[in-house]
From Swiss-Prot:
GO biological process, one term: translation
Lineage: Bacteria, Pseudomonadati, Pseudomonadota, Alphaproteobacteria, Hyphomicrobiales
Full protein name: Large ribosomal subunit protein uL30
Coiled-coil boundaries: none
HAMAP family: Ribosomal_uL30_B
Gene that encodes the chain: rpmD
Length: 68
């Protein structure tokens, strides 16, 4: 029988602070992948290496608001 884990997953909240206008398509797609598509929208995401890599790729367009 599998054990249930009750550990709380770490999360990171990001906010879009830059416009994707006149940015490469890959950066726009990364923002959409993070769930951001309009200015000042915030999303709480699971803190994984993939999400951290996406944040780093568009670090000039997003801001990390909170880490838990």
């Amino acid at each position: 029988m599998a054990k249930k884990t009750t550990e709380a997953k770490k999360t990171v909240t990001v906010e879009q602070i830059g416009s994707p206008i006149r940015r490469p398509a890959i950066q726009r797609q990364t923002l959409v992948g993070l769930g951001l598509n309009k200015m000042h929208r915030q999303r709480t995401l699971e803190d994984t290496p993939a999400v951290r890599g996406m944040i780093r790729a568009v670090q000039h367009l997003v801001r990390v608001v909170d880490e838990k």
